[in-house]
């Protein structure tokens, strides 16, 4: 019996989630991947339902087409383990491994962990799982200005930051708590220095704009900032305008670096306060 797990092609060559196709016998209960987690040293923890045995594993680097070896070590299952869907079961119903690259992987560099495992019935699961190199030197940002409202193009809502500590932006996350459909923006890999100004533009509404991944990169657009490093959100629609909270975190589940609460003029008026956003 054979089971294949393939990744759909996306803008970076691979989708965020693998697509599984199963071809199994009627009596087979094939092993399945129930959870994965990339660690700070770029090791990937893989959890399987059932008893799994590794047949092969390697790291593929899409940007260069190169492959790297990785070590495979069995892991104990935590007593409080839950899978990616929040389900739990008896510890002895799972198998876990830590797969560690044997060569360094750059901060934010895409890589694919691929390989094969088998179960006790000799069914085979081939997998290809996309990740990005861990940010071991995250920069620290502080919010200095926010413009959550604009009424006319090409003006785009923005958040301005100052870099408090030098490092890399890779994975640093802006969480728009009020937007249930598109709550997160993650910065791409870019080295920044303490004292630099960073501007995140909420929307991409002009031609010629691009992320300023280096200090020498210059973005087009009437709203780009000559004295700052510009980054552009993938959205075209206006962000939520009700009372809202913006969080800056070192990764979706990382530590909070800064936060801000804002309200519309109507919301302020309800509370007996007066404040208006000027469209300037």
Predicted regions and their residues:
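A structural motif detector for short, solvent-exposed N-terminal "entry" segments of globular domains
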Residues: 14-35, 39, 123-178, 235-242, ...
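Short, surface-exposed alpha-helix to beta-strand junction/turn motifs within ectodomains of secreted
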Residues: 53-76, 172
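Sec-dependent bacterial lipoprotein signal peptides
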Residues: 1-12
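Surface-exposed, short loops/turns at beta-strand junctions within beta-sandwich domains
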Residues: 101-110
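Short proline/glycine-enriched turn/loop motifs at strand-loop junctions of beta-rich domains
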Residues: 49-56, 165-169
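Solvent-exposed beta-edge/loop recognition patches
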Residues: 106-107, 189, 194-280
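Aromatic sugar-binding surface patches on proteins
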Residues: 79-100, 197
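Short edge beta-strand/loop segments characteristic of extracellular beta-sandwich folds
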Residues: 45-49, 160-162
């Amino acid at each position: 019996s054979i089971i294949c797990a393939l990744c759909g092609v996306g803008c970076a060559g691979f989708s965020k989630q693998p697509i599984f196709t199963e071809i199994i016998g009627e009596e087979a209960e094939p092993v399945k991947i129930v959870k994965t987690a990339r660690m700070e040293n770029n090791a990937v923890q893989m959890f399987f339902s059932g008893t799994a045995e590794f047949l092969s594993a390697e790291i593929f680097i899409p940007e260069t087409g190169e492959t790297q070896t990785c070590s495979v070590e069995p892991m104990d299952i935590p007593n409080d383990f839950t899978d990616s869907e929040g389900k739990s079961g008896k510890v002895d119903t799972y198998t876990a491994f830590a797969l560690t690259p044997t060569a360094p992987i750059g901060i934010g560099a895409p890589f694919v962990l691929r390989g094969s495992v088998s179960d006790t019935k000799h069914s085979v699961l081939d997998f290809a799982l996309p990740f990005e190199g861990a940010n071991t030197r995250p920069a620290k940002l502080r919010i200095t200005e926010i413009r959550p409202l604009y009424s006319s193009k090409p003006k785009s809502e923005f958040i301005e930051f100052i870099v408090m500590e030098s490092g890399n932006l890779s994975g640093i996350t802006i969480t728009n708590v009020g937007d249930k459909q598109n709550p997160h923006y993650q910065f791409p890999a870019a080295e920044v220095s303490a004292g630099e100004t960073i501007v995140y533009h909420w929307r991409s509404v002009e031609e010629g704009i691009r992320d300023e991944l280096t200090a020498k990169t210059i973005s087009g657009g009437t709203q780009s900032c000559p004295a700052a490093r510009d980054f552009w959100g993938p959205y075209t629609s206006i962000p939520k305008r009700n009372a809202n909270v913006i969080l800056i975190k070192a990764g979706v589940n990382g530590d909070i670096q800064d936060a801000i609460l804002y309200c519309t003029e109507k919301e302020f008026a309800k509370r007996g306060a007066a404040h208006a956003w000027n469209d300037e």
